[in-house]
Swiss-Prot record:
Residues 85-210 form a coiled coil. Expressed principally in liver. Weakly expressed in kidney. Binds to adipocytes. Increased expression and colocalization with activated ITGB3 in glomeruli of patients with nephrotic syndrome showing effaced podocyte foot processes (at protein level). Its main location: secreted. Induction: Down-regulated by insulin. The gene is ANGPTL3. This is Angiopoietin-related protein 3. Residues 17-165 are annotated as: Sufficient to inhibit LPL lipase activity.
Amino acid sequence: MFTIKLLLFIVPLVISSRIDQDNSSFDSLSPEPKSRFAMLDDVKILANGLLQLGHGLKDFVHKTKGQINDIFQKLNIFDQSFYDLSLQTSEIKEEEKELRRTTYKLQVKNEEVKNMSLELNSKLESLLEEKILLQQKVKYLEEQLTNLIQNQPETPEHPEVTSLKTFVEKQDNSIKDLLQTVEDQYKQLNQQHSQIKEIENQLRRTSIQEPTEISLSSKPRAPRTTPFLQLNEIRNVKHDGIPAECTTIYNRGEHTSGMYAIRPSNSQVFHVYCDVISGSPWTLIQHRIDGSQNFNETWENYKYGFGRLDGEFWLGLEKIYSIVKQSNYVLRIELEDWKDNKHYIEYSFYLGNHETNYTLHLVAITGNVPNAIPENKDLVFSTWDHKAKGHFNCPEGYSGGWWWHDECGENNLNGKYNKPRAKSKPERRRGLSWKSQNGRLYSIKSTKMLIHPTDSESFE
């Protein structure tokens, strides 16, 4: 452009100068005939100007062509990005439709489960009432039979009485089987209801977070945990025949380890795992076997329980207190190290209520492993979000809630599960460990904490 402007400026000057020379010559000289061709100098100037103009135009064309190529490349990149974004938008819309369909199905299923749960509750209450009536009738018949036997000891039992007793026993067994079936179905419904609620919450969070702009990157989600103990509560069940403790269940003839419903005095009904050891029933309050359950939980979860009774779990401080306040109890701790060596120790103990932060006071009785828990001292329970005075960073340092004294010590059966066995001492201290004051440090693979009343007859 600059060259063109320069030529446009030079050419008029040359022409003007030439005209002036011609005029001056015309004035000073006699008229001469004009030449038919331009002067040689003028031709050279014009040729030089045109040459420069050509070079300038050539440079301009090359530069313009490069700019056009850059523009086309950017347009191609933009087209590809737009196409990719369109595909992602279509995929997101399809996923959203699928999520909405799934949400609708889950809502329908949830309503069905709710209706089934209400129906089962109604049936369960009616069955319990019928059982109470039948028990009263059986008791009345037994009293009549006793009177008949006492009044007529030498008279053989009447066939009708025998058949009546057999019929009543069969009815009672049938009702027991039916109640057990209803409780099993109730457990399954509770589990399904919890799973449906969890899926609904995930879908609700997904629908709330609908994208206002499309991003090509996504952030990973943090893993979730299941804080509260599943399959462990049945509320609003009113029946005096529910046992208060595992010993009662055992005394009624149930000699198999498993999950059972109990209702301690002045407490709600909940499920426990009754573990029969050498012909004696124990209530399992803690179990660690494989690290599948996170034990670095909050105070609320330690208070009411978490995990699964058929796996790793903590029964809950409030439930433990509701059991042990009924009588004097023994605490049994079973340990298994990574060499498959099994150890145990038993304590007589006292557990306070929530106002004392569930203070534990114990004395070792027997066992085949040295005691590692301070005796005759008030041990206060602490978690990372509920620390007792003097515990400072004990829950964080040991990755779980536990009973501590003034010092943290090196014992915590609710610590982090190290799998496989931790090599360094700091890692072993943060995990499941057991160490007496002057003894060796045991790195633990599995643990059980169980309780049993000292006076079993009081629960018959």
